[in-house]
Regions:
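Alpha-helical promoter-recognition and RNA polymerase-docking modules of transcription initiation factors
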Residues: 1-117, 121-135, 139
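Charged, low-cysteine interdomain linkers and short loop/connector segments
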Residues: 13, 110, 123-188
Length: 188
């Protein structure tokens, strides 16, 4: 793991973000060898940690994206982790990679799971509201009020209402509504 990480880092230094710099194709034989070894090391680290991606993806299943889409996004996060991993810091790679994988998946869910995309900061704020609400419900034994949630988050009730309003789901104008003739639509 450490050796593979060092080889990837050497490749990243020689190349520009893992890609051979088109302007400077004149590498020495040793540099070409280092790049080749670095690419193989990157590939080995990616393959060795795909099970981690799948296990993280299963935790986010049912939150707006299919499992395969989550695995794909997690693989992009894993690739970023492989490229940025610094083995000299003493952390295990899987611990480091977990953060990048999870970050990639949560961003994808925030950006792709809704008809109208919410900004990431709003999605994160909404997630923290849900977490505080769950924690308070567990602590109080009942669903907390908006005032209790706002106090726990140290924000105004108006700000809480604003975030919750922006996060409401959308409805299609072609959705049928209960009408006398059975042919009424929301857009009518």
């Amino acid at each position: 793991e450490i050796e593979l990480g060092n080889q990837v880092q050497k490749m990243m230094i020689l190349t520009e973000d893992g890609q051979i710099n088109e302007k400077n194709k004149e590498f020495t034989t040793q540099q070409k060898r280092t790049i080749k070894i670095g690419r193989r090391s990157k590939e080995r680290m990616m393959k060795a940690n795909l099970r981690l991606v799948v296990s993280v993806a299963k935790k986010y299943q049912g939150k707006g994206l299919e499992l395969l889409d989550l695995v794909q996004e997690g693989s992009l996060g894993l690739e970023r982790a492989v490229e940025k991993f610094d083995p000299t810091r003493g952390y295990k790679f899987s611990t480091y990679a977990f953060w990048w994988i999870r970050q990639s998946m949560t961003r994808a869910i925030a950006c792709q799971s809704r008809t109208i995309r919410l900004p990431v900061h709003l999605s994160e704020r909404l997630a923290s509201i849900r977490k505080v609400s769950r924690d308070l419900a567990h602590k109080l034994g009942a669903m907390p009020s908006r005032i209790e949630i706002a106090e726990a988050m140290e924000i105004d009730v108006e700000e809480l209402d604003s975030v919750l309003r922006q996060a409401l789901s959308t409805s299609s104008l072609d959705a049928p509504v209960n009408g006398d003739d059975g042919r009424s639509f929301l857009g009518d």
